[in-house]
Amino acid sequence: MAAGKFASLPRNMPVNHQFPLASSMDLLSSKSPLVERRADAYQDVSIHGTLPRKKKGPPPIRSCDNFSHVGTLPHSRSPRHHSPLIQDVIQEQPLQDWKGEAFTFRDQHLLDPTLEYVKFSKERHVMDRTPERLKKELEEELLLSSEDLRSHAWYHGRIPRQVSENLMQRDGDFLVRDSLSSPGDFVLTCQWKNLPQHFKIRRTVVRLSEAYSRVQYQFEMESFDSIPGLVRCYVGNRRPISQQSGAIIFQPVNRTVPLRCLEERYGASSPDRAHEGSLTEGRPDAAKRLSLTVGGTQAREQGLPRGNLLRNKEKSGSQPACLDHMQDRRALSLKAHQSESYLPIGGKLTPQSPSVGTSPCPNSPVFRTGSEPTLSPAVVRRVSSDARPGEALRGSDSQLCPKPPPKPCKAPLLKAPPSPSIWLNSEANYCELNPALAASYDGASRLPFCAQDSYVELLTAKQNGGLGTRNSDTSYLILDDDDRTRPWKPPPAPGDTVGEDQDTFVMPLLETTSSFKPNDFESKLLPPENKPLETSMLKRAKELFTNSDPKVIAQHLLSVDCKVARILEVSEEMRKNMGVNSGLELITLPYGHQLRLDIIERHNTMAIGIAVDILGCTGSLEDRAATLNKIIQVAVELKDSMGDLYSFSAIMKALEMPQITRLEKTWTALRHQYTQTAILYEKQLKPFSKVLHEGRESTCVPPNNVSVPLLMPLVTLMEREAVTFEGTDMWEKNDESCEIMLNHLATARLMAEAADSYRMNAERILAGFQPDEEMSEVFKTEFQMRLLWGSKGAQVNQTERYEKFNQILTALSRKLEPPPVKQMEF
């Protein structure tokens, strides 16, 4: 017993019996007393209760298993005696003595003082992966020195290239990772112009003297002593990473788990595993990738130090690790993330080498997945979309690929344009419109299904179980349906007659010119050619505005808005050209670009016109206060009576311009002379406008009271460039801007669905309304453009017009109330 692990324990202990260690199942009952037996009568048994398989030849003396924390007893050469205490133990390979008698080695009623430690060792993996433990470990990393790369959440360690690309969501996102192709170097991954880009951080050693040198990091020109310093410079100064790409980084993509978890998941893997999916951070119960023990792999694993025990248990790769206790692993509810192939083990295996004495493996619920060829080539298996707990385990190609694969091409895949016959077959495919295709279509045969590049067709393919072409060379063993088996009817010839009652889909027209034509506008108030801000025209417009009731003004605004947004007075021909029944649907579609530009043009022009109405009052302070009072009353009517949130937002935008808000004397006069109006503006209109622009319109406005919804957040988001740093709205500078943007997009979907409701509300509100010709002309966009910029300036570029008029408004504001002059001290 000198070689035993417990030979030094005192023999007078009531639990000191030279039996093999018991498993946790032995705690269920303890009925019969324990009887001492000879230690050499039993074979070594793992502490997890799994009996070893018998190999050919004499049983070898093995060292402790990787999953055994205490050890096993040595073999004995003496004959084994049957123990009456050991019953109902299932053996995988029962050993035979010289007489062919089978023996068992476990006692169900056996107790051992190391049992609690065994139980702890089984649950140690679960305890190490709790969210609290991971959060604490992440906080410890982030509390390191700022010059330590691990203290920055944008550093993700050794993650594959494709995983880093999947983490990029918008332009400006970035992270830093270790280079898998050249260990020791770092790569900055970012997104710019909707394309992920990778920049290797150059690492140079500067030798200051024979005994001292330092490492510096750089992209192109300037070098830095540390990577955090480099990132701070490029983020803070908005400096392009390279002059050729022009990529700018400003939004870090932070990790949500400690680097240890990323190392365990991706550290030992090859870049090929990057195609398996994006990083599932924040899920500590995610599955470990495991595989079965094959042959003599156990001997190689024993050479690892004990300090790497967790890595041994959680080893991933096609070079498999050891699974001693499958039932314990199934208790952890491990989920398998499947890859391209799905290879069950337990059927016919590839013959092993004669030197490795293995017996046929019984049917097992364990599966192996990886990117190796299938073990059974005759069977074609389909990829499953989900995996039940404990059903599948996967491997990787960590040691099968000595060098990294070629990097994916950044150029977009060239595909054939979609066939116009698709538009003739379905009304749902007008989202990707090309006006040149209909004219060039000559009745040729339709393109293969895989060449269609429509999002609607992709969804249809997924619903039917088929997939199109992929942007990779990987074979997924999926039998795609042959396109030739699909029935297709050719479009009718030009000479064929179609019944009048038969509905035919007419391809929408892609508008390329604005509906506002200032020079072609026939006006009763403006001459054929006029200069910007003519005094006579300003006085006439102000006279009409001052002498009219606020409700009448609001009705005229609503009438013009409904025509511009194509809510009312939409002809049948216009509906066919749009492809939809309302402009509220058109602005949500890709080819509604021109209508969105027109809506933005009218909104900005209206806001500037209101600001000119206030700042153009060169008379007394009381006149400006009266004009301000009338404008606020019109805003109240638009909000409560008309339900025109579009014009309401234009008035609120004008009142919140810096050139208007700085007029302290004017606002003070408003509070003194029109106290109720000032209170109404501060307590109701401003909070209501804020709620609208935060996407909470449905919580404060009844749907049956809205005739024109809030349009500007949606059209601004859809028409803005990929990245802008100036001209953002107030809600975009909020901490919850992402959630607010999602609310606006969800509201746009509801707005398109309820287009008929808005139309009926507008018709009900404007029932019996008789517009005044002159006032209707004043509130038309063409008139306002001619009045503000003149007949020639109205044709200038929109951005240039707005910039120049912003300077004019600033000059008018300073003329009315000059800024205080700072006295110089001598």
UniProtKB/Swiss-Prot annotation:
Residue ranges, annotated region (Disordered): 46-81, 268-287, 294-321, 348-406, 480-501
Q: Which InterPro entries match?
A: Ras_GEF_dom_sf, RASGEF_cat_dom, RASGEF_cat_dom_sf, SH2, SH2-Ras-GEF_adapter, SH2_dom_sf, SH2_SHEP1/BCAR3/NSP1
Q: Which residues carry this modification: N-acetylalanine?
A: 2
Query: Domain SH2 spans what residues?
Result: 154-253
Q: Which keywords are on file for this protein?
A: Acetylation, Cell junction, Cytoplasm, Guanine-nucleotide releasing factor, Methylation, Phosphoprotein, SH2 domain
PTM field: Phosphorylated on tyrosine residues.
Q: Which GO terms describe its molecular function?
A: guanyl-nucleotide exchange factor activity; phosphotyrosine residue binding
Map out region (Mediates the interaction with BCAR1/p130CAS) in residue numbers: 745-749
Entries under CDD domains matching the protein: SH2_BCAR3
Write down the position(s) of the site called Required for interaction with NEDD9: 749
- Where's it found, cell-wise? Cytoplasm; Cell junction, Focal adhesion
Q: Where is the composition biased (Polar residues)?
A: 350-361
Family annotation (SMART domains): RasGEF, SH2
Gene Ontology CC: one annotated term? membrane
Q: Where in the sequence is N6-methyllysine found?
A: 335
Major place of residence: cytoplasm
Quaternary structure annotation from Swiss-Prot or TrEMBL? Part of a complex comprised of PTPRA, BCAR1, BCAR3 (via SH2 domain) and SRC; the formation of the complex is dependent on integrin mediated-tyrosine phosphorylation of PTPRA. Within the complex, interacts (via SH2 domain) with PTPRA (when phosphorylated on 'Tyr-797'). Interacts (via Ras-GEF domain) with BCAR1. Interacts (via Ras-GEF domain) with NEDD9. Interacts with PTK2/FAK1. Interacts with PTPN1. Interacts (via SH2 domain) with EGFR (when tyrosine-phosphorylated).
Q: Report what the protein is called.
A: Breast cancer anti-estrogen resistance protein 3 homolog
